Regions:
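Catalytic-site signature of metal-activated, phosphate-bearing donor transferases
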Residues: 1-182
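Membrane-interface aromatic/basic loop that binds lipid-linked glycans or pyrophosphate carriers
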Residues: 186
C-alpha cells in the first residue's frame, strides 16, 4: 500500500466519523508496472469497514453490502494478482469461472433492470451490466476489444496487451463452463 493510503487509514481508524466503511482504489500491477488502462481502474473496493456493518455477496469477486454510510479514501492500494505467476492466476480463474457459471445459470431467467443499469448504485449497475454482458455472443472478443482499444490498454505496453488477452481467455473459460454445466443439467455428455 502507498504511504499516503497508510496515513489515511490510520486517521480513519482513529476517527471514522459516521462512516460504516471506506472504499479505496486499487492499482493492479503486472510485469513490473501499473496496468492503468487495461485494468478496470478506477474501480472502488470496500477494504476498511466495521465488521458489524458489512456483509459479503458472491463467491468470486465478492461484493460488500454496507449497512450505513460509505466514504472514500484518496490513496491507492497496490494489488499484485500475478505475484505467484500466471499459472496460479489461471488456476484461480478456472475456479472463478466455475462460480460465475453457477451464479449466471441460477439468475439467467431474471430480467435486466434497465433503470439500475443506467442510474443505479454502482454495485447494482455492475450486476446488471454482467447480466447484459453474459447474454452477448463473442464475449471474449468484446472483452479484449474493450480493454485493449476502448480503455486504451495499448498504452500499458506489452503488459496491457497480455492482460487484455488473459481477461479474454477468462471470459472464454466462463463460456465453456456455462456450456458444460448446461449440458450436465440436461443430462447430455460434456
Amino acid at each position: 500500500m502507498t504511504s499516503g493510503l497508510w496515513r489515511e487509514i490510520c486517521e480513519r481508524v482513529e476517527n471514522p466519523g459516521d462512516f460504516a466503511a471506506f472504499e479505496m482504489r486499487r492499482q493492479d500491477m503486472f510485469m513490473g508496472r501499473w496496468i492503468k488502462h487495461s485494468s478496470f481502474y478506477p474501480c472502488w473496493f470496500v477494504r476498511l469497514y466495521r465488521p458489524d456493518c458489512v456483509r459479503w455477496e458472491r463467491l468470486a469477486n465478492e461484493v460488500a453490502i454496507v449497512a450505513g454510510k460509505t466514504g472514500r479514501l484518496s490513496g491507492h492500494f497496490l494489488h499484485y494478482p500475478f505475484s505467484k505467476g500466471t499459472a496460479a492466476w489461471f488456476k484461480r480463474h478456472i475456479q472463478y469461472a466455475e462460480f460465475e457459471s453457477r451464479e449466471l445459470l441460477s439468475s439467467r431467467a431474471e430480467k435486466i433492470d434497465w433503470r439500475s443499469l443506467v442510474a443505479g448504485e454502482p454495485q447494482e449497475r455492475r450486476r446488471q451490466l454482467k447480466r447484459l454482458f453474459y447474454r452477448m455472443p463473442a464475449r471474449p472478443l468484446i472483452k479484449f476489444f474493450v480493454l485493449y482499444f476502448l480503455r486504451r490498454g495499448f498504452l500499458d505496453g506489452r503488459a496491457g496487451y497480455n492482460y487484455a488477452r488473459m481477461q479474454a481467455i477468462y471470459e472464454f473459460m466462463i463460456q465453456l463452463r456455462i456450456m458444460e454445466d448446461s449440458r450436465k443439467a440436461r443430462g447430455e455428455p460434456v
